[in-house]
């Protein structure tokens, strides 16, 4: 099945959809005047948070993705730790402004997210928030565990999540990142062959899991199987949806138009991940920024992506990994309340997406699933710097171009500032430990080799000599 499988949602159908979504929003739209000033200071939302009641729970349309908590240097001098004080501040602010859905997983923040999230949330009444976490046994499977050994390690992961999150039940629980790796074979090995699917279903019957779902990336056969043949009555499904992936999904991913439509026709609520593609849709090419700003000068670039994701009525919540307070405040303004896209705005974003695919960025969402690299390479930082230079027009291509010297200098200086030399692409040995964990299907060693070759050409000024 290709990425365009399934019926397309037409312009007329989308207008009907967002018209229905608009019924659930009320009050004024946007932030107060402070947020509109040229100083970029973001103010308080003018209205109340938009909520969806698709699972029986009153869930905030903006959900907190806990994959990108702020980090700080470890006082012991080894690596980084979560900045717990800042996490507490972000969580307190989010709860005070209507966010009640918090999504985490055992691998997030290099294994530190669940504990940090649990510490922050446990300071508040348990009935004031919903916790979502995951059975993330893909790395256990990738490490070679099978059968009973995989089951025991998976059960331990599940039990540890209760401890770290300081709770005795999960509101939402997911089988994590189904569809990646070896597709159907890996899904069967992770869920059925080791018996963990039966174990989790019994946990739901016992009440320790309130709602059960799965998150999907990759092989569409896995997605279709889980909906059509698994026999599990899914309460929700988490998919990657944004205005670029709607019809232009890259790598191993499937067009979001198909994924959403399949869930909607089965009345299975969708939880949205990567509405901003790990920040890529807020750091688009300057030409795209100008296009968006001409349309709505007072809206942030990111708000377009969040309005798109929230405008579909079968969306339960839209997750955002808000590392900084200004991101949290901006997104709160977008969803307090949501102003659904109009028909013309939907078409405008699709035209924008058509334009964006012309810029050949690497589809890295900075999820850090590829980290840590055993050889110390900062993979996300390398890929993000490369994309940043493309989006800012600082990509030196031709030595005869009048902007070549300026772009060359910007790329090389920025590379050394963004990535310490011992962590740059030149140190990649091609072990490929990283690629199987990438939900975007990036061939990371190939990209490291390509970027390293490109950097060496720039350093030796070879392009200018062509």
How should each PLM-predicted stretch be described?
Residues 394-428, 460-466:
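Short Fe-S-cluster ligation motifs
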């Amino acid at each position: 099945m290709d990425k365009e499988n399934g019926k397309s949602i037409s312009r007329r159908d989308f207008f009907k959809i967002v018209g229905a979504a608009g019924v659930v929003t009320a009050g004024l739209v946007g932030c107060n005047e402070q947020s509109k000033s040229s100083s970029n200071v973001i103010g308080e939302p003018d209205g109340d948070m938009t909520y969806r009641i698709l699972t029986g729970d009153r869930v905030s349309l903006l959900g907190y993705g806990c994959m990108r908590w702020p980090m700080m240097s470890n006082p012991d001098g080894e690596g980084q730790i979560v900045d717990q004080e800042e996490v507490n501040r972000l969580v307190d602010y989010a709860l005070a402004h209507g966010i009640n859905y918090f999504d985490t997983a055992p691998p997030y923040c290099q294994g530190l997210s669940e504990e940090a999230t649990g510490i922050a949330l446990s300071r508040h009444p348990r009935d004031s928030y919903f916790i979502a976490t995951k059975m993330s046994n893909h790395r256990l499977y990738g490490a070679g565990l099978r059968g009973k050994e995989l089951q025991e390690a998976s059960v331990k992961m599940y039990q540890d999540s209760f401890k770290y999150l300081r709770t005795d039940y999960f509101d939402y629980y997911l089988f994590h990142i189904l569809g990646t790796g070896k597709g159907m074979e890996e899904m069967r090995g992770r869920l059925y062959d080791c018996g963990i699917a039966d174990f989790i279903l019994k946990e739901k019957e016992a009440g320790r899991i309130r709602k059960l779902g799965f998150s999907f990336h990759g092989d569409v056969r896995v997605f279709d199987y889980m909906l059509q043949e698994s026999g599990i009555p899914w309460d929700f499904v988490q998919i990657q949806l944004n205005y670029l992936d709607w019809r232009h999904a890259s790598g191993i991913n499937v067009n979001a138009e198909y994924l959403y439509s399949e869930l909607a026709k089965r009345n299975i609520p969708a939880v949205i991940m990567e509405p901003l593609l790990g920040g890529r849709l807020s750091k688009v090419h300057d030409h795209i920024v100008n296009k968006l700003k001409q349309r709505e000068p007072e809206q942030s670039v990111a708000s377009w992506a969040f309005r798109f994701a929230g405008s579909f009525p079968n969306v339960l919540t839209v997750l955002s990994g808000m590392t900084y307070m200004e991101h949290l405040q901006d997104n709160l303004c977008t969803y307090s309340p949501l102003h659904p896209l109009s028909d013309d705005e939907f078409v405008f974003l699709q035209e924008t997406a058509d334009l964006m695919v012309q810029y050949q960025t690497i589809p890295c969402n900075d999820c850090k699933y590829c980290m840590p690299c055993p050889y110390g390479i900062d993979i996300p930082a390398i890929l993000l710097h490369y994309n940043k230079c493309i989006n800012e027009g600082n990509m030196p291509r031709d030595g005869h171009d009048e902007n070549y010297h300026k772009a060359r200098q910007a790329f090389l200086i920025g590379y050394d500032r963004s990535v310490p030399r011992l962590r740059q692409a030149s140190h990649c040995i091609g072990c490929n430990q990283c690629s199987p964990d990438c939900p975007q299907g990036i061939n990371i060693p190939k990209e490291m080799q390509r970027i390293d070759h490109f950097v060496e050409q720039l350093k030796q000024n070879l392009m200018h000599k062509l």
